[in-house]
Amino acid sequence: MVNLRLQVAVVGAPTVGKTAFVQMLHSNGTTFPKNYLMTLGCDFIVKEVPVDDDNTVEMIIFDVSGQREYEPMVSSYLQNTAVFIVMYDVSNKVTFEACARWVNQVRTNSKESVGILIANKSDLSDKAEVTDRQGKDLANANKMKFYKISTLRGVGITEPIDEIARHYVDAYQKRIEQLTQMR
């Protein structure tokens, strides 16, 4: 049995749904926050993600404020981050345009981290200002995986986290095999 620990940062412009996403993960999809409270600096949760009968990944998930006034502190939250999630609101093009800045900021502070791009608020598709193609193109250009979710509806919120956990366990097992063969 393997228990691995992993640091994940969720970043993006204000009001894209980062806090709601993290809170939904924490409650296993049962509690959508009814009131919006701006994240001050950074909040975090610890989430255990079972991968199979033998492996679990404990994720320390940081919900990083998107407010500019907290930007000087953001780099300290991003250090040692193995995975980063950049989130935008499909109904707000400005939040999508901010994604490139977030990707650059994370990669400056944590060069080896794996990136995921999440298009949130898919329940607002009738008001979409960003197409799926635009999201996928941005993800591909930055070597990131792309997911489309609705935190409000609880649709797709576990897929990115489950994928991260599976990828992390697979990478760990491959590394163990490599080290074993070196003997």
From Swiss-Prot:
Pfam families: Ras
InterPro entries in the cross-refs: P-loop_NTPase, RabL4_euk, Small_GTP-bd, Small_GTPase
Localization of this protein: Cell projection, Cilium, Flagellum
Listed GO biological process terms: intraciliary anterograde transport; intraciliary retrograde transport; intraciliary transport involved in cilium assembly; protein transport; regulation of cilium assembly; small GTPase-mediated signal transduction
Keyword Transport annotated: yes
Binding-site residues for GTP, renumbered to this chain: 12-19, 63-67, 120-123
An annotated GO cellular component: ciliary basal body
Source organism, top-level taxon: Eukaryota
Entry keyword set: Cell projection, Cilium, Flagellum, GTP-binding, Nucleotide-binding, Protein transport, Transport
Alphabetical list of CDD domains matching this protein: RabL4 (cd04101)
GO MF term list: GTP binding; GTPase activity
Function: Small GTPase-like component of the intraflagellar transport (IFT) complex B required for both anterograde and retrograde intraflagellar transport. May be involved in cargo loading of the retrograde transport.
Subunit structure: Component of the IFT complex B.
Family (UniProt): Belongs to the small GTPase superfamily. Rab family.
Protein name, as recorded: Intraflagellar transport protein 27 homolog
